[in-house]
Amino acid sequence: SMYYHTTSLANSAADNSYRYAGANPNNYVCFGSTASTCPSGNLYRIIGVFGSEVKLIKATSYGSYKWNSSENNTWSSSTLNAGTLNGTYLSGLSSTWQNKIATTNWKVGGMSQNSSATAKQYYDTEIGSSSSSTTYSAKIGLMYVSDYGFAASPDYWTTELFNYEPSKSSNWMNINLNEWTISRSSDNTN
């Protein structure tokens, strides 16, 4: 299902976004190909609609990559960002498809490693009212922790993400793999 995150939707991001949530919403889209049957490498899922922009995530794993090859947790200099996503991956798309991707100001200030936060609390710290002013402008990013939290059925939005194991069957983002997020730990710099 798609949920409109207004201030009247309990425990939501309250940012007027539209987000898909639940076990298996029909939120698939083919990006980077015009083939009649979408190649698996071009299959994405819509996280949500934020203003006039649609945020996508690959439907399957992109592979095993390090967030960074050095002991540094700054997104602007991470190898996953500069080398892989906004490097190899982006340059592998034709200019037609590259031009469909908006340059976005990603909030990358990070947050303290807090195991007792809900999706809304993570949202506020990552990109909402309590977020850092540190941004990074790029076409490709990663999901936020709160994106994962809000992809579960709304029944879980009051659950601390540390205890999200029971939500796996009702969270379309769960692919039973560890995944990187763009949110770094602000507790240390490496």
Predicted regions and their residues:
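Long, domain-scale functional regions
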Residues: S1-N190
